[in-house]
UniProtKB/Swiss-Prot annotation:
Residues 1-13 have a biased composition (Basic and acidic residues). Belongs to the histone deacetylase family. HD type 2 subfamily. This is Histone deacetylase HDA1. SUPFAM superfamilies: Arginase/deacetylase. It comes from Candida albicans (strain SC5314 / ATCC MYA-2876). It is found in: Nucleus. Residues 1-40, 760-791 are annotated as: Disordered. GO terms for biological process: cellular response to alkaline pH; cellular response to starvation; epigenetic regulation of gene expression; filamentous growth; filamentous growth of a population of unicellular organisms in response to biotic stimulus; filamentous growth of a population of unicellular organisms in response to pH; filamentous growth of a population of unicellular organisms in response to starvation; negative regulation of transcription by RNA polymerase II. InterPro entries: Arb2-like_domain, HDAC_PDAC, His_deacetylse, His_deacetylse_dom, His_deacetylse_dom_sf, Hist_deAcase_II_yeast, Ureohydrolase_dom_sf. Keywords: Chromatin regulator, Coiled coil, Hydrolase, Nucleus, Repressor, Transcription, Transcription regulation, Virulence.
Length: 833
């Protein structure tokens, strides 16, 4: 294309655009330009065929896009198109500096209700006035765990982190860009009486005028509380501050809130202060929200992650379907404070409130981030989402934090941050975090800071990668089985009928179902193989003596007695007997993930360990050893089927007690009469092994030492049983020297999970820290002074396997166990020679 042609086309384009622009309105500006440019380009098609079409394509693209494409064409472009001679060039942001700036979307106010708001903070130094009356200098230097400095240290930590701006730590009102100070007030009597009785309120009120002696008496006789003349004021401020923290969230003045208050509240019951708590702060606040905001607050969730069960909060809403109470706490079968069964997993509410209480009771100390996160992911998050609350209140005790000797657990600041972050994603972020317990000043301040950061908008500090402990998985599974009755979100992988309800199918009046305990045919298969291949025989049990003697069994017997005990055909004439006692075998199977049904075609049972022992001994025993070997096998059923069609207790059968009694029965009625017997080796598998240790403490030590040459046990997480001799203290050394106990690497004797320390929670708080759990300094139930050491001699010679699970422990340590059996027998034989 020639230069003259280009100039001619440019001139025509400019004239065309100028004419059409003058005739159009401002609002049709983009459309007019595009129409005119398109018309001009169509005229280009009529140009002489001598013009190179490729050059035209390069210089004048035939695809016309947006107005911006026209005003800012790709290079090379011979000349920029101007709409008017006086038009200014757009700036770097594409905005022209004149009155004709194009507006496509007018500026709008951000459609955000949450992000622009601050996090609310409740704090008042007057709550520090509640303090224990000192009676000695030692109480001053070793203060009560519920220390007034708790709230000060948390507030100070927030200031040190820059989240709160208060250099003088005076509790000022203007605290910076991240948090908004919520004015605190005293709770009114009317508000407190929504939860507590009038007598309860009058008692706390009376402490204002009590004498020193009266205050000391109430402190001494109360259930882990102390009082002074300022306790009533502090308690009203703590309760009122909790109400205001929730109120500010509901009214939209803050996006969420953190109430640094004391005294705590979740142990205070309607009629009784307890566990350092005077008024049930969270319960009073929840009642207040439901009453005063009936349109916006219909359902509330209370998540209590204090290490102690919130018995007071649970009682306040036990029959109220509007409040879902969830508690994670150290329980220890009701032995940990508050020391009742009220926090067990089967406590689910009553009346209209049934199904609106969820307890997740840890069996021991030592729980960590992985355990709490697992419970949140499997139970708490799906259940709260299904409940769909209008407000979430957290009873935030930090006594499960790492470093707190009372809780003796290991939740880190990152763990608390993760839990807070999870709850922020529900109920449109309407979350109020209220301080409860926590008695290590460093731990409580660091944990509260992590929560505050997440409330303000920071993500959790770290990703939680720690795996849950087996104990936590088991507890969570038990809770899911119970709560799946009430929450659909927990039913994935759970059978449509609760396991206990399956027995109703066997009611002959209602159906033709006949139930079979799978353990019975498995045992029948085991003994059939022993009968056919090893020619074993049944050993009978006579449960009812004919001569009027006391029955040998205090529990009901299993149904299938004929296969319970089997032995070698010539057991009476054997000089060496290996006795095995075991639980029913483990079953490996694929489980349908939608309904929990076991897929039978993929179900496997490992070969009976006794058969493996017999084969290996036959191969490896000394050929010169002419001892006649015999074998005796005892199977201990795990439980007894209920009587079909009845609601009564079907059986008093207890597998642990039965195992102990049946082994004593075999010793007294069979082994004692084997005249040829010289060597006896005991081999235990699983929980049944405890019966062997029980035998050693119940029968004369000289008989035990003379006959038994060794003890071998294969355990998963079975609690170790100590040998407690009645008379002969040397039995402990004998047991240690002649035993080998293989355990899972997660057995509590190594992890300290079964009661590391004898802390009893809030305990009897009158004696300071010592009464609230000595924590990790005392020995655990498996005899440790330090978890890095081996268990004491009274537990036998304990060896830790590298694996977890009974089958894996057997597979790993089987050869070593059989070698120990052979060494025990052959060493004795050689010593006789």
């Amino acid at each position: 294309m020639s230069t003259g042609q280009e100039e001619h086309l440019d001139s025509k384009l400019e004239n065309q655009i100028s004419e059409e622009e003058n005739q159009s309105q401002n609002q049709n500006f983009p459309t007019a330009i595009e129409d005119s440019i398109q018309a001009s380009i169509e005229k280009l098609d009529e140009v002489d065929d001598e013009i190179n079409p490729i050059e035209v394509k390069d210089e004048f693209p035939t695809t016309i896009g947006t107005t911006y494409d026209i005003l800012h064409p790709r290079e090379p472009f011979p000349k920029r198109i101007k709409l008017e001679e006086t038009e200014t060039e757009p700036d770097s942001n594409g905005i022209a500096d004149n009155d004709q700036t194009m507006v496509v979307v007018p500026p709008k106010k951000p459609q955000l209700f949450y992000t622009p708001l601050k996090t609310g903070l409740v704090y008042d130094v007057r709550m520090r006035y509640h303090a224990k009356v000192f009676t000695s200098y030692s109480e001053y230097i070793d203060p009560h765990p519920e220390d007034p400095r708790r709230i000060y240290r948390i507030y100070k930590k927030l200031v040190e982190a820059g989240i709160v701006l208060d250099p003088s730590l005076a509790g000022i009102n203007e605290i910076g860009p991240f948090m908004l100070k919520i004015p605190i007030r005293e709770a009114t009597s009317e508000e407190i009486l929504q939860v507590h009785s009038e007598d309860h309120l009058k008692f706390i009120q009376s402490t204002e005028d009590m004498s020193r002696d009266q205050l000391l008496k109430e402190t001494e006789t109360g259930d882990s509380i102390y009082v002074n003349n300022d306790s009533y004021l502090s308690a009203k401020l703590s309760c009122g501050g909790t109400i205001e923290a929730c109120k500010a969230v509901i009214e939209g003045r803050v996006k969420n809130s953190l109430a640094i208050v004391r005294p705590p509240g979740h142990h205070a019951e309607p009629n009784t202060p307890a566990g350092f708590c005077l008024f049930s702060n969270v319960a009073v606040a929840a009642k207040n929200m439901l009453k005063n905001y009936p349109e916006s607050v219909r359902r509330i969730v209370i998540v209590d992650w204090d290490i102690h069960h919130g018995n007071g909060t649970q009682k306040a809403f036990y029959n109220d379907p509007r409040v879902l109470y969830i508690s994670l706490h150290r329980f220890e079968n009701g032995k940990f404070y508050p020391g009742t069964k009220y926090g067990d997993l089967n406590q689910v509410g009553e009346g209209p409130g049934e199904g609106f209480t969820i307890n997740i009771p840890w069996r021991s100390s030592g729980m960590h981030d992985g355990d709490y996160v697992y419970a949140f992911n499997k139970i708490i998050q799906p259940v709260i989402s299904e409940f769909d609350p209008d407000l979430i209140i957290v009873s935030s005790g930090f006594d499960a934090a790492d470093g707190d000797v009372i809780g003796a657990c290991h939740v880190t600041p990152a763990g608390y941050g993760y839990m807070t972050h999870t709850l922020k994603g529900i109920a449109r972020g309407k979350l109020a975090v209220i301080l409860e317990g926590g008695y290590n000043l460093d731990s409580i301040s660091k944990s509260a800071l992590a929560v505050a950061k997440v409330l303000v908008g920071e993500p959790p500090e770290n990703t939680i990668t720690l795996r849950p402990q087996a104990e936590a998985i088991e507890v969570v599974d038990e809770v899911i089985k119970i709560q799946s009755k009430y929450f659909k979100s927990l039913r994935n992988g759970i059978p449509n009928g609760i396991f206990e309800d399956v027995y109703d199918l066997a009611d002959v009046e209602k159906s033709n179902y006949k139930l079979v305990n799978i353990a019975d045919p498995i045992r029948s298969h085991q003994v059939e193989k022993l009968f056919n291949e090893k020619e074993f025989i049944n050993i009978p049990i006579i449960s009812s003596p004919s001569n009027g003697e006391k029955p040998p069994f205090t529990t009901d017997l299993p149904d299938q007695l004929e296969d319970l005990i089997v032995a070698s055909p010539d057991i009476y004439n054997c000089t060496t007997i290996i006795l095995t006692i075991h639980d029913p075998p483990e079953i490996w199977a694929n489980i349908n993930p939608t309904n929990g049904v076991i897929e039978t075609n993929s179900t496997m049972v490992l070969e009976h360990p006794l058969v493996q022992i017999m084969d290996k001994i036959q191969k490896e025993k000394d050929p010169e050893n002419q001892e006649k070997f015999g074998y005796l096998d005892i199977n201990i059923p795990s439980f007894q089927l209920p009587i079909p069609g009845t609601t009564s207790e079907s059986s008093t059968y207890n597998p642990i007690i039965f195992a102990q009694e049946v082994l004593l029965y075999i010793w007294d009625n069979y082994i004692a009469y084997f005249q040829q017997l010289k060597n006896l080796v005991m081999v235990g598998f699983g929980d049944s092994y405890q019966s062997i240790v029980n035998l050693y403490g119940k029968r004369p030590s000289n008989e035990i030492k003379d006959l038994i040459k060794g003890t071998v046990a294969f355990l998963n997480r079975t609690t170790l049983k100590p040998l407690i001799p009645v008379m002969d203290e040397s039995m402990v050394d004998w047991y240690y020297q002649n035993s080998i106990i293989f355990t899972s690497n997660f057995n509590t004797c190594w992890t300290g999970g079964s009661g590391a320390g004898n802390g009893n929670g809030n305990g009897n708080g009158n004696n300071g820290n010592s009464s609230n759990g000595g924590g990790n300094k005392s020995a655990d139930s498996n005899g440790h002074d330090d978890f890095s050491k081996r268990p004491r001699k009274k537990f036998g010679r304990v060896i830790k396997a590298k694996t977890d699970g009974l089958c894996d422990v057997i597979q790993e340590k089987f050869d070593e166990g059989v070698d120990f059996i052979l060494d025990s027998i052959e060493d004795y034989s050689s010593s006789e020679d």
